């Protein structure tokens, strides 16, 4: 029956939408990559032929191609694989049955009847249900029809009963393009409406009016398929049909939604283009309307940028808003938000002006009687405002020259502004409508604007000699009634009220200040171009900008009317209360305290709280009327804004009501804050606070940790305090559920004392609001106090304590009382209080000598709890003291530079406030030796030491005499010190101990040294201070560091007569004065330097006890000495033979050789920098110099040293910067191309292995779904930028396996196809070496893994195409990538993000901050290098667990599990490692070098004597003209790149002893002379001869409790081209060399000390980073040390002398090193030059010296 039915209706099959697809589903397992080109061409030809047959078939039998229909006839052509839909989505007999249509019988086809599709059929019945249309169906869409339109009628209006009918209905046009689909749908909907099917069309809500019948659904489906061929359907329509090929209703519904959206978009665009605004409606409503339109358009894909939006908005502004059109010139990139700020400001100004019209508007009669010849003028000496405006400017200028007390007569309208209004525009916004917050000025300062004035702007005046302004709110440092006479152009006087500074903050973030005069008697604010020119600012009227002489644009100029203006938004408003200008002669006795002063005095409390406190007498000594409150409302404290910045406030009323029924001190709230990071061990990291519910009295206690015993001690203390002081018993303590409160110890304590613990519910912070708000308030105050005072962060708890004292004394607005009053205590006497951080001078009652200064500069912290004194911080002594012997330092405000506090001098206010208290102190002073009470428990700084269990060092300190003589202790007799800002040093030694603050009476006697550095013509010599004597200045450091168990210094004292010295005269270069210094043996000098703290400035203390002082050896110093000796003992330093008595002592090493002939470019540099090279010039023996290399050495003859003159110009000299990393050198190509490995490879066996590797790679790519295998793209149809060339590379690995890799040519990838900001991270070599070293010391298992095809696990976001592999023979086709293919720019970054996410989320790892690709958890450390993983763990099962997790996602291979206890060999990132757990580790590259070096074509000498050193001292690179042809030059450069590339790779891996030679030769890669090549050959020869050398590590002693990280530094002064110095550093962890660096100094040093400072400063950042890494990977404490052989450098670093350095660059480096040493527990050691292994990094050494320095760590 089915076949008969098909044949019966075969004559109308042309009208169906059936596709010619086989009745069977085609199944194939054939890989698309294996399809040959011939088969593909046959398939395409067959498909083309079939399509042409269908095209030529008559209309009556034509069947459009549609893959969504099953054809009742078998197809004669196999389906194309590259169709618009995937093959598996094409309709088959088993897939064609639509849901709900089973009653039609056959499941393989959609039934249809003749009446549904025949154009001549009329259905039976009285009326025709479906329309008929002519046989010429399918007119193109471009053909207009009378019934087709661009709009459609809502289907709801159609007749649902379908009673009306049309005899003929014009069919819709044929769809010919996907872009025409929206218009076609409109005609199709019109066609359905005309066909009486309007009721089935979805309405605006997506639902039809009536239910569609089956016949109607069939008609709808078939007509849609006829007139909308599948190849022209949009993608979203195809997506719908791929799910349900009959769901035409969903397509219509989506189309209607899109048309509605398009209509809304069109309406929005029209509305936006026709905006109008004149202020008649609120600005908020206008902004909401505009922003909603813009947001809708952006969401719909129509992007409206800021420039277009601002233009559309400004075009519709009128009235007083019209002038905003011209603000576009001042902002090239104005945003919509900024424009609406302007509109809001004007709108608010309009509302304010309307509410106060009687105050500003003038009567109409006044306007008529107004005269322009008023006596007061506005323009001082103005001849022409803008020289460019010569025409039509006379009347405007004349108008500007006169003052009017009211508005001028209206003028005619022009293009630049709307018609003048009767109301002036008042602009009070301090940023010219842009800076947000308004400054409300008093009525006196308001001035009516002229009708031709641009509000909020300054008029540029080229003829005015002074700048005048009407408003006083932009005047800084104002002084009233200045004696200044100003006249206008008509010689008439202009009264001036004040003079001050006008400060600008331009758009290049620079600040400039000019003088300004204040007068309200002008019509414009005038900005003098002459004064701007004085500060290097000119006005360019061609570009309409203010700019500097170098062309830097500062601000735009706006042309308005006939004048030019600059916006006031660049003016900085004054942050202080402007003094009353007209009241100058105010009596001193009646002058009130300014509010900013009181605000800062009372811990930055708000004005309301302070006023309540003064009203209720909780603050005594003065009344509320004594404070000037005029500026309290508008005053903004910058420190409060920074320190108290919050997100939102806590929710109030969260506590239970019953808590109010408790008596005082019965109900407490407590909470713990912390930790505070990056603090010294002596400073607390936490504090615990308590608040009484009834009185709101607060207590705070410092904590170092949150242990149970620490918390219990605090609870015991506060309960005893409340019981004894207030006779109250605590009943309830409310706290959160932290472990510090819920532990069993505290719970038993509370239970024993009868106290009920009240815990908050989980995650209910609101129930703990009292304690939370207190902590927030105290922290706000703390940040503000530290910000205001500039004190270091380790004093943070002192700020908390100060704030607590003040907060307990301030009245609550609710209770009208302070916490002290509620508790029954007296109010706080403010005369006893100093601002936090107030500079003071503390009296030293026991100075070093009678001639030493008696004052020590300090900073007041807070009143003492235990005495009438004050807690004061002394930076020079690193102490806090409790004393009454201090005097306030006048004129010193410790402020930050970014705020203008220069004008905030409250000296007189502070003197008046503390006068009575100072007199009380003066009359009751007790001259006793214990005035400085250091044993009080005032705060944590005096009570807590680094190691309290160790005996305290009572050695005293000397006060540095560098400070100026302090003022007298009597305030009334002291003179005002010059007002320069003094800030507390932020970076000082924060370690505070309980040792004595002032020096003891026993002193060590040492001579005074004043001359530190000689700066003669040579700049060579530095007087070695530590040689002469141990500095007394070291006393300054000794007591503060005595408590450190890890300190590198000792406090031993030596007498000047302890040994017999011989005076040796030393003359400084270029000078005539001779210094007589004692000659000291090297051994004694070394001992003194290591155990002393040398300094630049030393003070000679008195010695009254004896001439011979025995060193004081306390247990602390002995412990320090043991620590020092243990660190030095761990280092691989050479063992020196006994020195000859003829050798000179070490001080002379600092003397560089004085030689009149010296080259500027050398491999060996100046040679040995020791003084004996110059003083006693000895030629080394032949065996020290010979290097037996049997290749050409014609150019290696030793040349006479040339003079120190700049090199002559050369025809070809190419010098590059020193090599910073291995990747900067062009690597050697070790891979083969496809033709080399397969096509032309004559080695059959090797070829077969490469072919096998080739197929293995292709199969792996297919397995990983690297590209889309369903479709191939024509090369001509793809954007060339997205096409990436591909290639196969082949190589043979060291294990003998042959590998093939199919890669993309990322080197020619277009920048638009990848994100340039993405980074491909790999593990840093220092991180790997650190991990290996820690593994050896901790007996870790080392497991090596490899992830196969790592990059292919990462998806690719971009649309990229590559050429198929060559075996497919599809050269003109492309395939689209789906994975991050090898070679792409973004592949590495994509893989890194993928594996990083997996390790963190699935493996429980976390990445170490600052060290990419280093992951850790509590048991395992992972170092990741692309697809290689190195796992370190003490438990091998932990490694296995990670491996199991990785195998779930990635193809993970275990290269080496590392479970054996015997020696295990690894090949990790090129390093050949031999590791025996718990014993040793050896790192080398013997196998790799044996394979690679012979391939370099270097003339090796395998039979001759081996080289003993990589280079010869004294040989210099001759930089004469290099004249070779271009081809030979390129060839030699290429050869140098290969040689230095390999040498760099080896050197930075483990051969750190070669880095100097590598770095020097790398600078000459582009200067390949014969001599440079020979030296390079010699370096490669030495590498070949020593290829079996290894970096040797031995396990650290198990008794060592700490990790020891040491950097050894050295520098060779002036031995590089252009007088640059070579610097080098070696880094050691627990005595194992883990890295090295040799480079040329970036700055030109003028002395050896500068070179050494440069070298040390280069090592400090890496030293700190390595320290952080070690602490993250291993939780043991760490000691950081610096070793150098320059005593003068150590003296400078440890000195406290802050005098100006000779060179600001090195002065900055020296000061930074001081901060590192004093603040970060970084210790500096002295090391003998002969033991300095970093010497190999800076100069070529003789063979014996080279071997001596390297044989202990590499052999």
Swiss-Prot record:
Region described as Integrase-type zinc finger-like: 583-640
Compositionally biased region (Polar residues): 48-60, 127-152, 1005-1015, 1054-1082, 1101-1111
Integrase catalytic domain span: 660-835
Localization in the cell: Cytoplasm; Nucleus
Gene Ontology cellular-component annotations: cytoplasm; nucleus
GO molecular function: aspartic-type endopeptidase activity; ATP binding; DNA binding; DNA-directed DNA polymerase activity; RNA binding; RNA-directed DNA polymerase activity; RNA-DNA hybrid ribonuclease activity; zinc ion binding
PTM entry text: Initially, virus-like particles (VLPs) are composed of the structural unprocessed proteins Gag and Gag-Pol, and also contain the host initiator methionine tRNA (tRNA(i)-Met) which serves as a primer for minus-strand DNA synthesis, and a dimer of genomic Ty RNA. Processing of the polyproteins occurs within the particle and proceeds by an ordered pathway, called maturation. First, the protease (PR) is released by autocatalytic cleavage of the Gag-Pol polyprotein yielding capsid protein p45 and a Pol-p154 precursor protein.
Miscellaneous comment as given in the Swiss-Prot or TrEMBL entry: Retrotransposons are mobile genetic entities that are able to replicate via an RNA intermediate and a reverse transcription step. In contrast to retroviruses, retrotransposons are non-infectious, lack an envelope and remain intracellular. Ty1 retrotransposons belong to the copia elements (pseudoviridae).
Protein name, per record: Transposon Ty1-JR1 Gag-Pol polyprotein
Record organism: Saccharomyces cerevisiae (strain ATCC 204508 / S288c)
Phylogenetic lineage: Eukaryota, Fungi, Dikarya, Ascomycota, Saccharomycotina
């Amino acid at each position: 029956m089915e076949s008969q039915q098909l044949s019966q209706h075969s004559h109308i099959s042309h009208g169906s939408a059936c596709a010619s697809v086989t009745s069977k589903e085609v199944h194939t397992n054939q890989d698309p990559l294996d399809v040959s080109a011939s088969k593909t061409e046959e398939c395409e030809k067959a498909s083309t032929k079939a399509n042409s047959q269908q095209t030529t078939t008559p209309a009556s039998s034509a069947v459009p191609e549609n893959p969504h229909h099953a054809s009742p006839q078998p197809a004669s052509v196999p389906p194309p694989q590259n169709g618009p839909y995937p093959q598996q989505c094409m309709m088959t007999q088993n897939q064609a049955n639509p849901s709900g249509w089973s009653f039609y019988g056959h499941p393989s086809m959609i039934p249809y009847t003749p009446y549904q599709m025949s154009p001549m059929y009329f259905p039976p019945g009285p009326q025709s249900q479906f329309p008929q249309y002519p046989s010429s169906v399918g007119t193109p869409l471009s053909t207009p029809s009378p019934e087709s339109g661009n709009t459609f009628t809502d289907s709801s209006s159609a007749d649902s009963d379908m009673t009306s009918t049309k005899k003929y209905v014009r069919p819709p046009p044929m769809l010919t393009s996907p872009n025409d689909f929206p218009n076609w749908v409109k005609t199709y909907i019109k066609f359905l409406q005309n066909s009486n099917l309007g009721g089935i069309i979805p309405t605006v809500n997506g639902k039809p009016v009536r239910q569609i019948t089956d016949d109607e659904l069939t008609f709808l489906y078939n007509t849609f398929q006829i007139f909308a061929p599948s190849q022209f359907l949009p993608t979203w329509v195809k997506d719908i049909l791929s799910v349900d090929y009959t769901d035409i209703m969903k397509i219509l519904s989506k189309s209607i939604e899109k048309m509605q959206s398009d209509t809304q978009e069109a309406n929005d665009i029209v509305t936006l283009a026709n905006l109008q605004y004149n202020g008649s409606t609120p600005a908020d409503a206008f902004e909401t309307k505009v922003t909603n339109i813009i947001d809708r358009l952006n969401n719909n894909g129509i992007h409206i940028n800021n420039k277009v939006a601002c233009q559309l908005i400004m075009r519709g502004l009128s009235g007083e808003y019209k002038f905003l059109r011209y603000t576009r010139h001042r902002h090239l990139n104005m945003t919509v938000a900024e424009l609406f700020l302007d509109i809001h400001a004007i709108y608010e100004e309009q509302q304010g002006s309307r509410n106060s019209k009687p105050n500003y508007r003038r009567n109409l009669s006044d306007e008529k009687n107004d005269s322009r010849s008023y006596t007061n003028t506005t323009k001082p000496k103005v001849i022409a405002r803008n020289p460019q405006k010569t025409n039509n400017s006379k009347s405007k200028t004349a108008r500007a020259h006169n003052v009017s007390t009211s508005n001028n007569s209206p003028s005619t309208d022009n293009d630049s502004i709307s018609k003048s209004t009767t109301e002036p525009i008042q602009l009070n916004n301090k940023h010219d409508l842009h800076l947000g917050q308004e400054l409300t000025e008093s009525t006196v300062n308001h001035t009516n604007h002229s009708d031709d004035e641009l509000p909020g702007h300054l008029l540029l005046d080229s003829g005015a000699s002074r700048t005048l302004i009407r408003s006083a709110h932009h005047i800084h440092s104002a002084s009233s009634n200045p004696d200044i006479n100003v006249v206008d152009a008509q010689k008439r006087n202009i009264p001036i009220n004040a003079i001050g500074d006008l400060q600008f903050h331009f758009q290049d973030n620079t600040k400039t200040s000019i003088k300004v005069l204040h007068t309200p008697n002008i019509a414009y604010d005038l900005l003098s171009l002459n004064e701007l020119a004085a500060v290097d600012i000119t006005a360019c009227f061609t570009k309409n900008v203010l700019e500097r002489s170098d062309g830097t644009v500062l601000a735009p100029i706006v042309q308005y009317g006939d004048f030019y203006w600059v916006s006031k938004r660049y003016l900085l408003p004054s942050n202080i209360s402007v003094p009353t200008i007209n009241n100058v002669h105010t009596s001193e006795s009646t002058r009130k305290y300014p509010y900013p002063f009181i605000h800062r005095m009372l811990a930055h409390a708000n004005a309301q709280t302070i006023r309540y406190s003064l009203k209720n007498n909780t603050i005594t000594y003065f009344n509320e009327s004594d404070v000037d409150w005029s500026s309290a409302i508008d005053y903004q404290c910058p420190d409060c804004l920074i320190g108290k910045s919050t997100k939102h406030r806590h929710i109030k009323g969260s506590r239970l009501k019953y808590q109010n029924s408790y008596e005082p001190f019965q109900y407490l709230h407590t909470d713990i804050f912390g930790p505070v990071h990056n603090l010294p061990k002596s400073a607390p990291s936490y504090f615990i606070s308590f608040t009484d519910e009834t009185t709101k009295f607060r207590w705070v206690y410092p904590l170092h940790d949150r242990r149970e015993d620490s918390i219990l001690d605090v609870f015991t203390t506060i309960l005893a305090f409340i019981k004894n002081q207030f006779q109250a018993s605590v009943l309830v303590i409310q706290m959160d559920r932290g472990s510090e409160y819920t532990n069993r110890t505290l719970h038993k304590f509370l239970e024993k004392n009868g106290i009920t613990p009240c815990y908050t519910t989980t995650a209910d912070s609101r129930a703990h609001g009292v304690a939370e708000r207190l902590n927030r308030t105290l922290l706000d105050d703390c940040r503000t106090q530290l910000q205001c005072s500039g004190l270091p962060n380790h004093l943070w708890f002192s700020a908390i304590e100060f704030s607590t004292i003040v907060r307990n004394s301030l009245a609550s607005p609710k209770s009208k009382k302070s916490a002290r009053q509620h508790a029954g205590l007296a109010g706080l006497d403010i005369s006893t209080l100093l601002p936090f951080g107030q500079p003071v001078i503390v009296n030293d009652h026991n100075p070093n000598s009678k001639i030493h200064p008696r004052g020590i500069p300090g900073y007041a912290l807070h009143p003492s709890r235990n005495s009438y004194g004050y807690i004061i911080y002394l930076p020079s002594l690193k102490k806090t003291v409790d004393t009454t012997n201090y005097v306030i330092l006048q004129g010193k405000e410790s402020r930050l530079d970014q705020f203008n506090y220069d004008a905030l001098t409250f000296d007189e206010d502070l003197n008046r406030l503390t006068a009575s208290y100072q007199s009380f102190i003066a009359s009751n002073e007790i001259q006793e030796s214990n005035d400085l009470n250091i044993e009080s428990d005032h705060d944590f700084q005096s009570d807590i030491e680094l190691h309290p269990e160790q005996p305290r060092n009572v050695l005293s300190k000397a006060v540095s005499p560098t400070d100026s003589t302090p003022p007298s202790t009597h305030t009334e007799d002291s003179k005002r010190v010059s007002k320069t800002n003094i800030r507390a040093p932020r970076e000082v030694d924060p370690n505070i101990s309980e040792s004595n603050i002032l020096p003891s009476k026993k002193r060590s006697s040492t001579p005074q040294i004043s001359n530190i550095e000689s700066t003669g013509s040579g700049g060579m010599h530095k007087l070695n201070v530590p040689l002469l004597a141990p500095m007394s200045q070291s006393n300054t450091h000794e007591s503060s560091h005595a408590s450190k168990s890890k300190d590198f210094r000792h406090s031993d004292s030596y007498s000047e007569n302890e040994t017999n010295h011989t005076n040796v005269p030393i003359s400084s270069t270029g000078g005539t004065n001779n210094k007589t210094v004692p000659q000291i043996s090297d051994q004694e000098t070394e001992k003194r330097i290591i155990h002393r703290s040398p300094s630049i400035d030393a003070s000679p203390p008195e010695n009254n006890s004896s001439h011979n002082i025995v060193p004081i050896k306390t247990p602390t110093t002995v412990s320090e000495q043991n620590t020092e000796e243990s660190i030095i003992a761990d280092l691989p330093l050479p063992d020196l033979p006994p020195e000859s008595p003829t050798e000179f002592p070490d001080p002379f090493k600092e003397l560089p050789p004085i030689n009149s002939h010296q080259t500027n470019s050398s491999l060996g540099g100046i040679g040995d920098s020791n003084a004996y090279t110059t003083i006693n010039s000895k030629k080394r023996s032949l065996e020290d110099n010979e290097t037996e290399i049997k290749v050409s050495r014609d150019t290696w003859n030793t040349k006479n040293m040339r003079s120190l003159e700049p090199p002559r110009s050369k025809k070809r000299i190419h010098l590059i910067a020193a090599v910073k990393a291995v990747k900067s050198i062009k690597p050697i190509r070790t891979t083969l191309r496809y033709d080399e490995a397969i096509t032309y490879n004559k080695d059959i066996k090797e070829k077969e292995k490469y072919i096998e590797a080739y197929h293995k790679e292709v199969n792996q790519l297919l397995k990983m779904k690297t590209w889309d295998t369903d479709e191939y793209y024509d090369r001509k149809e793809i954007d060339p930028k997205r096409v990436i060339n591909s290639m196969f590379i082949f190589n043979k690995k060291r294990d003998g396996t042959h590998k093939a890799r199919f890669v993309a040519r990322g080197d020619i990838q277009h920048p638009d196809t990848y994100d340039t900001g993405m980074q491909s991270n790999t593990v840093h070599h220092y991180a790997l070496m650190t991990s290996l070293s820690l593994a050896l010391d901790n007996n870790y298992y080392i497991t090596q893994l490899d992830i196969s095809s790592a990059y292919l696990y990462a998806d690719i976001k971009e649309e990229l195409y590559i050429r198929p592999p060559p075996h497919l023979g599809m050269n003109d086709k492309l395939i689209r990538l789906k994975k991050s293919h090898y070679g792409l720019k973004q592949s590495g970054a994509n893989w890194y993000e993928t594996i990083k996410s997996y390790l963190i989320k699935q493996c429980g790892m976390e990445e170490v901050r600052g060290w990419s690709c280093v992951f850790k958890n509590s048991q395992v450390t992972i170092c990741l290098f692309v697809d290689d993983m190195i796992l370190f763990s003490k438990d091998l099962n932990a490694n296995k667990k990670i491996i199991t997790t990785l195998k779930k996602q990635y193809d993970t291979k275990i290269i080496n599990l590392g479970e054996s206890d015997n020696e295990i060999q690894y090949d990790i990132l090129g390093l050949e490692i031999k590791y025996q757990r718990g014993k040793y580790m050896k790192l080398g590259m013997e196998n790799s070098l044996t394979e690679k070096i012979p391939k370099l074509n270097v003339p090796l000498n395998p039979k001759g004597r081996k080289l003993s050193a990589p280079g010869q001292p004294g040989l210099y690179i001759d930089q004469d003209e290099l004249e070779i042809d271009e081809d030979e030059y390129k060839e030699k450069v290429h050869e140098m790149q290969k040689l230095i590339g390999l040498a760099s790779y080896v050197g930075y891996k483990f051969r750190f002893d070669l880095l100097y030679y590598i770095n020097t030769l790398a600078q000459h890669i582009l200067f390949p002379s014969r001599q440079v090549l020979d030296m390079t050959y010699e370096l490669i020869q030495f590498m070949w001869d020593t290829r079996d050398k290894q970096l040797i590590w031995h396990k650290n002693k198990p008794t060592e409790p700490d990790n020891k990280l040491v950097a050894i530094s050295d520098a060779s002064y002036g031995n590089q081209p252009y007088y640059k110095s070579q610097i080098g550093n070696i880094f050691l962890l627990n005595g194992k060399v883990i890295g090295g660096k040799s480079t040329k100094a970036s700055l030109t040093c003028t002395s050896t000390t500068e070179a050494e400072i440069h070298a040390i400063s280069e090592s400090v950042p890496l030293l700190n980073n390595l320290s952080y890494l070690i602490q993250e990977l291993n939780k043991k404490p760490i000691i950081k040390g610096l070793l150098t052989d320059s005593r003068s450098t150590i003296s400078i670093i440890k000195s406290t002398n802050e005098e100006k350095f000779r060179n600001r660059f090195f002065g900055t480096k020296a000061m930074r090193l001081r901060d590192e040493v004093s603040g970060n527990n970084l210790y500096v050691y002295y090391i003998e030059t002969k033991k300095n292994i970093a010497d190999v990094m800076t100069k070529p050494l003789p063979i014996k010296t080279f071997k001596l320095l390297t044989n202990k760590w590499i052999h």
